[in-house]
């Protein structure tokens, strides 16, 4: 389980957020651009540090201002897929997926087995030796997700995970992403601006407004609050 209670002063407002996500659960964050959604992910992953607060993942404390604990990002074992994720264009699909394992000095036979399994699960085996520059947006997205999941993270953070995927392929990719998250059995937080992503991915939905949790609940509960201006416009598209 992930539990966070963090405060960080931003340029226009103070972000003050408390959230929890259970194992196997997907929490989707929505809100206006600049509301603090991606900042929440960056605070959790360790890219940014809170001014104060606590972040715990399972039995581990990742950050505690009171206890002066701040685990480096590379030691948090979090899979963070950015909106503008970057693959290595000069590498093949398999080499991209293996990159993090090589950085961890995992033995080569273990890398080969883990990469092969991840490619199978993401339907990428036939593309293992293809340079990623030749792939479609949906295929590149699957490679990026495979690269995150092969490290067996304890938490998955996805920022606009389908933004680079062709509209015609998004439905199938959304179902595939949902299946992979469920199979991993870890907490997951997704940031999106798309209603279809909410309906296809969210177990719980959270509206962030100027760095605060405005409302949280099931997708039906939150999307039913049409008196909220953002919710109304979000549903109407």
Regions found by a protein language model. Give the residues of each.
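Conserved ABC ATPase "signature" region
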Residues: 60-65, 102, 109-127, 178-179
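ABC ATPase NBD coupling module
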Residues: 62-79, 103, 108-112, 222-226
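Conserved ABC ATPase signature
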Residues: 131-135, 139
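A short, proline-enriched helix->beta-strand linker immediately N-terminal to the Walker B motif
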Residues: 150-154
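ABC ATPase "signature
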Residues: 216-217, 225
């Amino acid at each position: 389980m992930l539990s966070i209670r963090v405060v960080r002063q931003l340029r226009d407002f103070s972000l003050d957020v408390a959230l929890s996500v259970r194992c196997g659960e997907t929490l989707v964050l929505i809100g206006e651009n600049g509301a603090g959604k991606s900042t929440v992910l960056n605070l959790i992953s360790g890219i940014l540090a809170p001014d104060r607060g606590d972040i715990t993942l399972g039995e581990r404390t990742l950050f505690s201002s009171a206890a002066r604990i701040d685990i480096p990002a590379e030691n948090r074992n979090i899979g963070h897929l950015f909106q503008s994720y970057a693959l290595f264009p000069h590498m093949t699909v398999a080499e991209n997926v293996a990159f993090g394992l090589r950085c961890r000095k995992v033995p080569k036979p273990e890398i080969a087995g883990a990469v092969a399994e991840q490619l199978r699960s993401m339907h990428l085996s036939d593309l293992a030796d293809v340079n990623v520059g030749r792939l479609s947006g949906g295929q590149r997205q699957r490679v990026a997700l495979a690269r995150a999941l092969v490290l067996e993270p304890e938490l998955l953070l996805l920022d606009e995970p389908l933004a680079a995927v062709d509209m015609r392929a998004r439905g199938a990719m959304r179902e595939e992403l949902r299946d992979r998250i469920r199979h991993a059995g870890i907490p997951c937080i997704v940031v999106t601006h798309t209603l279809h992503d909410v309906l296809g991915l969210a177990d719980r939905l959270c509206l962030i407004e100027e760095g605060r949790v405005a409302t949280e609940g099931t997708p039906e509960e939150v999307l039913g609050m049409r008196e909220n201006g953002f919710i109304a416009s979000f549903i109407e598209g």
